[in-house]
Amino acid sequence: SDYMINKMIISDEVEPVDYDSMEYIGNIGDKYWEMSKSFDKDLKYTVPYFWGTVGILYNTEMMDYVPDSWNALWDEKYKNNIIMQNSVRDSFIPALILNNNSINTTDEGELRAALKKLQDQKELVQSYLVDEIRDDMANDQAAMGLIYSGEASLAREYNENLEYVVPKEGSDIWVDSWAIPKGGKNYEGAVKFLDFLCRDDVAMTNFEYVYYSTPNEAVLSQIDEEDKAGDNAIFPDDDIIERCEIFNYLGVEAEELYNRLWKELKVY
C-alpha cells in the first residue's frame, strides 16, 4: 500500500515498470495516477490496483444521528458501542484531524496531543480490531466503527441497517498498487502479469471479487450510474476525495515514535 511502496522506493527495493510495453495500462484513470504521485512522485514504479477511504461504518438502528464528524467517536452516549482500528496510523487519523493536524505529521507535540485524545476516548471503546470490525458491525455488535471503505461495503451486504460516511473534516485515502521487487528472476513476466491485471475483463473479475474501489476506467464504464450512486463507500464523490490525504512514509524515527505512542495507548 501507498506509504510502504514509498518506503520501498526510497530503499531502492523496486524496479521501474516498463509501461511502454503494456497494452492495457491506459485503462488506469488519470486521477488515480495523480493520487499515486504522493508515494511514487515520478510515476515510475507502480501500477494502481485498488483504492479507498477510511471512515465510519454505523448502524442506523443503534444511532440517532449520522456520524458525519469524527467527534462521534468520542460521544459518551455510545460508550462500549465504538470499535477502533487495531492499527497505529489508522487510529490516529480521527484524533490528528480533529486537532487540525496532518495525518502525516511527525511533530511529537502534535502526536502526543492526539495520543491524549485517544486516551480520553479509550474508556468509550468496546474493542480495537482489524478485519473483525466488518463482522462485528454486520452482526449488530456495535453502533459504529472506524473502517476501510471496502470492508464497510461488504458488511452492508449482510446488514441493511449499516451505512458508511467519510467525516466532513477529512480522512485518509489510500491506494494499493503493484510494484516489481528488485532482482526478480523474470522481469518481463512480471510486467506482462501487471498488464494482464489491467485488462478490462480481468480487472472486472477482480473488482467483483474484492469489491474495493477500482482505478480501472474500462471497468467503471461498465457499471450503471444507479449502482454507483447506491454505494458511496466504493464510489465516493469527488468532494470526498478532495478532503482526504494519502499516508506518506515518514521515516524510521517517526515510525518508531508512532509505535511508542501506540504502546502507551494500549497500556493506558
What are these regions (language model features)?
Residues 1-141:
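Extracytoplasmic ligand-binding site segments that recognize negatively charged/polar headgroups
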Residues 4, 133, 151-152, 202:
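Alpha-helix capping/helix-boundary segments
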Residues 15-26, 46-47, 160-172, 181-184:
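Short beta-strand->loop
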Residues 5-7, 144-161:
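A ligand-binding cleft/hinge motif common to bilobed small-molecule-binding domains
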Residues 111-120, 126, 158-182, 228:
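Periplasmic-binding protein-like
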Residues 55-62, 96-100, 174-186, 197, ...:
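A bilobed periplasmic-binding-protein/Venus flytrap-type ligand-binding module shared by bacterial periplasmic
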Residues 181-242:
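Mature extracytoplasmic/periplasmic domains
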Residues 238-268:
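Conserved C-terminal helix/tail region of periplasmic/extracytoplasmic solute-binding proteins
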